[in-house]
């Protein structure tokens, strides 16, 4: 019964958070298959590697620190944030190679997915190991669902945002951005673990996490608003060149695009996806070089032709 309840308490909230983050990214929503892959890395891969490396690092530290309480505090406050942020963030270095990973919003979504997966598995383990009474179990479920697991989401999403920012930058800026992102993610993790390790700082820890979550939500919102502006700006030239109607500009970057009547319903979804992708490909082209530049140029030509044919076929009906 405990294991079943713990599984539900661990999986349902985290997967719900994942769906919310994925849904909020409404202008260029990431393929859910890829988001889920990152989530599962956090839930399985990152957990396994974190456990292995934490054991190795802790064994090394125990050579110098013999006192059990001090060693446990050090493992919680320093070793866990360092090792876990590396194992969670490492997968993003593979995800960023995807052409789907192209802006800060994407970094937040993919990084957040990994953090939520990690938090889900960690929650389950905590629920079954430390929920020895009903009151303890409920308390742990509430705290970890609202704070600890969300901390993993925010920390790795932060690293993902820095990673996305660095993607089209020159080498020096790229390296410094990635390193800074890792340090910020580790600081968030370390600050939370430190605060809940001592009774006198627990309240401060909750306040810190509330503040951090608010900043995370604001950053996510600003990134979404930025995408809205990119869509309008990049499609303005397409309207001037006659590819799309001017009247569509203010529709394509708003919720009105999900309503009926402004374009032939048989092509609405395909049209929205195509013009939105075109807008972001144009922005990516400006920041790219080498093989990536050639890829985006080809993609832009493809989507322009696709949109032209789509609208022409509708007019000829």
Show which residues each predicted segment covers.
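Hydrophobic alpha-helical segments at protein termini of multi-pass membrane proteins
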Residues: 1-317
